């Protein structure tokens, strides 16, 4: 008998259509009467099982009641006749107990507990640890660490009341050396070493303790070995003495080694930063997109005279250098090239070195804005005869200087500003030539004048 399983909303009306497909098998169609409310309904889905067949025979058993999917998160109902559910491990009660166990486990983990929950049978250990801290503040309790954990703890408090009698045990120092061994545990013996301990500080403590105090300072790595030797060999003869100093000596050297480790680690091989610094010293100053800078030659006497006139006017940026070169030839005579005629294809410029740039000879009688020579004359190169733009031409139609092509500028600089000259910024005197130059061409930036 074909069986169909459906999940329908409660309180809804559906059209149930049973048909036979082309193969002959029954087909079931369930269409909601209100398709829009089918999507917006908040009622829970009800599982249905539909058997398609004849009415003869025994009806099928009813399906078991559906179990809520959130049963594990619900409290077990007191009215539930089967609290453990159909399966022992999946019922509401079993799931609630499992959640409780897991919550307890998480809390124990957060508190630092590890492992399973076991009855803490050996609770005497924490009590013994509690008794020890109360005893150590007094010096006579040091030998109690060597003795077993049960009996001697009760006896040390008794000799603590005995210290006012240091005189009688004077003949017993040799006997006390044999008393501390473990085989002898009577209550009468512990007081005798405790009484002798009060006398020994005046006799024996000053001699062994000073070297032990100096050892950790002088030999920090070896000090860890010295306490071990004092604890192993003199346990029998001087049990109370080496115990107390060794405990104090083991503590200070521990922070010392870490403090001494960083200094040797610091002087390591020179880091790569040193190499980068050396490289930075050789790099030219200025923006990275400028051409390489050449060292200026030693200025001659004639250059020094002209440099005194043009000082402060060669600091302008390279955008207007070409125009200034054109204007520098107006007031003076014809240009006389340098003796060396071999010139590179693209002259090297120095935007930073402005004070060392001279005019070669006293060609500029009038100090004006045209006294800046941007070319770096490392090899006395004659750049004016390279390009035709250096030929004498009228200042009415200035052209873009070929010394600074558009390709050399970063994208942030507008090539339209190449025609401007910045040499007038450093002017301090008036010259008829400078006024004529800037009156004709409009400038975007104000020109400081003394008018």
Swiss-Prot record:
GO CC terms, sorted: host cell nuclear matrix
Cited function: Plays a key role in the activation of the host resting B-cell and stimulation of B-cell proliferation. Acts by up-regulating the expression of viral EBNA1-6, LMP1, LMP2A and LMP2B genes, as well as several host genes including CD21, CD23 and MYC. Activates transcription by acting as an adapter molecule that binds to cellular sequence-specific DNA-binding proteins such as host CBF1, SMARCB1 and SPI1.
Primary location class: host cell
Gene from which this protein is expressed: EBNA2
Entry keywords, A to Z: Activator, Host nucleus, Host-virus interaction, Inhibition of host innate immune response by virus, Inhibition of host interferon signaling pathway by virus, Interferon antiviral system evasion, Modulation of host cell cycle by virus, Modulation of host PP1 activity by virus, Phosphoprotein, Repeat, Transcription, Transcription regulation, Viral immunoevasion
Sequence repeat windows: 311-312, 313-314, 315-316, 317-318, 319-320, 321-322, 323-324
GO BP terms in the entry: symbiont-mediated perturbation of host cell cycle progression; symbiont-mediated suppression of host innate immune response; symbiont-mediated suppression of host translation initiation; symbiont-mediated suppression of host type I interferon-mediated signaling pathway
Organism annotation: Epstein-Barr virus (strain GD1) (HHV-4)
Region (SMARCB1/INI1 binding): 1-176
Span list, region 6.5 X 2 AA tandem repeats of R-G: 311-324
Post-translational modification: Phosphorylated.
Protein's name according to its UniProt entry: Epstein-Barr nuclear antigen 2
């Amino acid at each position: 008998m074909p069986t169909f399983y459906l999940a329908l909303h409660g309180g809804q009306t559906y059209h149930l259509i049973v048909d036979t497909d082309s193969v002959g098998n029954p087909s079931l169609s369930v269409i909601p009467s209100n398709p829009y409310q089918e999507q917006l309904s908040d009622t829970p889905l009800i599982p249905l099982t539909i058997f398609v067949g004849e009415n003869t025979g025994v009806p099928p058993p009813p399906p078991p009641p559906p179990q809520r999917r959130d049963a594990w998160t619900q409290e077990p109902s007191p009215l539930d006749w089967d609290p453990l559910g159909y399966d022992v491990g999946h019922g509401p009660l079993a799931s609630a107990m499992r959640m409780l166990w897991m919550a307890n486990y998480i809390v124990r983990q957060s508190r630092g507990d590890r492992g399973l929950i076991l009855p803490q049978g050996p609770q005497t250990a924490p009590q013994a640890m509690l008794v020890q801290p109360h005893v150590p503040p007094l010096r006579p309790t040091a030998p109690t660490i060597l003795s077993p954990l049960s009996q001697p703890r009760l006896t040390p408090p008794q000799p603590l009341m005995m210290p006012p009698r240091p005189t009688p045990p004077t003949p017993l120092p040799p006997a006390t050396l044999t008393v501390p061994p473990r085989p002898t545990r009577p209550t009468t013996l512990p007081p005798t070493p405790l009484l002798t301990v009060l006398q020994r500080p005046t006799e024996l403590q000053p001699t062994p303790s000073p070297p032990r105090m100096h050892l950790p300072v002088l030999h920090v790595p070896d000090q860890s070995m010295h306490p071990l030797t004092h604890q192993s060999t003199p346990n029998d003869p001087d049990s109370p003495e080496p115990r107390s100093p060794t405990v104090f000596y083991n503590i200070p050297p521990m922070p010392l080694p870490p403090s001494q480790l960083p200094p040797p680690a610091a002087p390591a091989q020179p880091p790569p930063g040193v190499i980068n610094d050396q490289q930075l010293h050789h790099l030219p100053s200025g923006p990275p997109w400028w051409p390489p800078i050449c060292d200026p030659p030693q200025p001659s006497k004639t250059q020094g005279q002209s440099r005194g006139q043009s000082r402060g006017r060669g600091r302008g940026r390279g955008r207007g250098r070409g125009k200034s070169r054109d204007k520098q030839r107006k007031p003076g005579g014809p240009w006389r090239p340098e003796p060396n005629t071999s010139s590179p294809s693209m002259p090297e410029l120095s935007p930073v070195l402005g004070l060392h740039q001279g005019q070669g000879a006293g060609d500029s009688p009038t100090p004006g804005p045209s006294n800046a020579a941007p070319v770096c004359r490392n090899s006395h190169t004659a750049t004016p005869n390279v390009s035709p733009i250096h030929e004498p031409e009228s200042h009415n139609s200035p052209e873009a200087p070929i010394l600074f092509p558009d390709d050399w500028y970063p994208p942030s600089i507008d090539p339209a500003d190449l025609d401007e000259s910045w040499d007038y910024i450093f002017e301090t005197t008036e010259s008829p030539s400078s006024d004529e130059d800037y009156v004709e061409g409009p400038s975007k930036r104000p020109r400081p004048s003394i008018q």
